Each structure stands twice: as structure tokens, then as C-alpha cells.
Amino acid sequence: MSTKVPIYLKRGSRKGKKEKLRDLLSSDMISPPLGDFRHTIHIGSGGGSDMFGDISFLQGKFHLLPGTMVEGPEEDGTFDLPFQFTRTATVCGRELPDGPSPLLKNAISLPVIGGPQALTLPTAQAPPKPPRLHLETPQPSPQEGGSVDIWRIPETGSPNSGLTPESGAEEPFLSNASSLLSLHVDLGPSILDDVLQIMDQDLDSMQIPT
């Protein structure tokens, strides 16, 4: 306990100003660590004579502990049996043996947070990825003859390069082109020629002396 005057017995400031919280608190008011005792509940094979800790989860049903005697057969099913070893030991109303239970060679271990139970939790599923637009021209496989023109529709005004697309490969491309998720960009030689002409005009205008 701190030897200083408690907060509620301190007088207010003479000037009427509100005191700050850091002026009222001190390091002596903080208690030291109380230790870390993790083994807070223990129920041994001896039953009531070998247990300590908070056993409020039993709710007064101490007859469920190992090593205790059952008064009569469970006829009306009023007892709640949360432990599997008790359910198997009281089949057909037989009493438990006086000695230590063969099913309980060690003390009962309660579940630990972060133990094997944590591995059974469902993992959060990742959201589905949005569909990607096919902006790049797909590379033809070697089985299709190595022709690049089978993957694009020839333009009506573009000059023919001499490589004619196959008739069998033209139909599936038309069906893919009609899809909203497919986008095919064809930069033909006509657009490239226009870009090169503009670049040449800019170079000529820079070389003309003013």
C-alpha cells in the first residue's frame, strides 16, 4: 500500500484549476507483478482428495469425479455427464471401482488456449480474384504450325502479308472476340507507318535552320 494520501482526500488547487491526471498518479500506486501461476486447476485420479483450483465448472456434481461411488443406476437421465470416461464407466448402472480409474492414469488435462484445438478452426478464405483481361496476344503453340496470324482477325484495309490464316482456327477466335472478358488489340502496320511519318516530320523540322 502506498503511504501517500489517496486521490479522493487531496485538496483541490488553490487557483481553481483542474489538476492533470499525471500529477495525481504516482509509480507507488502500481502493484508489482503477482506471478504467473498457470496450473490453476488440478483434478487427479484420486477424485475429491486430489484436486485444487477453481472447480466451479462441475456445478456441484462431484459424483462425476473419478474414484467416487455411484449410488444407483442412471434411470431418468437427470445427470449431465460431460466426461467421456464417466459415461463409459457407468454403463448398465455398474459402480466405479474403489481404486484409481484405469482410464485415468494421469491427471485430467483441461484444454489449453492455442493448443491443438486452435488448429481445427476454419481458416478465412481468400476473396475470389477478378477476371483478368487478355491484353496480350496469346503465343501460338508449336502444334498449330507457328503462324502468328491465326490468333487475330485480318483487317479489311490492311495489306496482306502473304500468310493466310487457317480456316479451322478462325472460328474459335470469333467466338472469343465476342466475349466481354476478352480484349484483343491489333496494332497493324498502318498505325506504325503513321507514327514513323510523324517522327520523321519532327526530325526534319528540327534540322531546318531558322
UniProtKB/Swiss-Prot annotation:
Residues 122-171 are annotated as: Disordered. It is found in: Endomembrane system; Cytoplasm, Cytoskeleton. Keywords: Acetylation, Cell shape, Cytoplasm, Cytoskeleton, Membrane, Phosphoprotein. SMART domains: PBD. The modification N-acetylserine is found at residue 2. Probably involved in the organization of the actin cytoskeleton. May act downstream of CDC42 to induce actin filament assembly leading to cell shape changes. Induces pseudopodia formation in fibroblasts in a CDC42-dependent manner. Interacts with RHOQ and CDC42 in a GTP-dependent manner, and with SEPT7. This is Cdc42 effector protein 2. The gene is CDC42EP2.
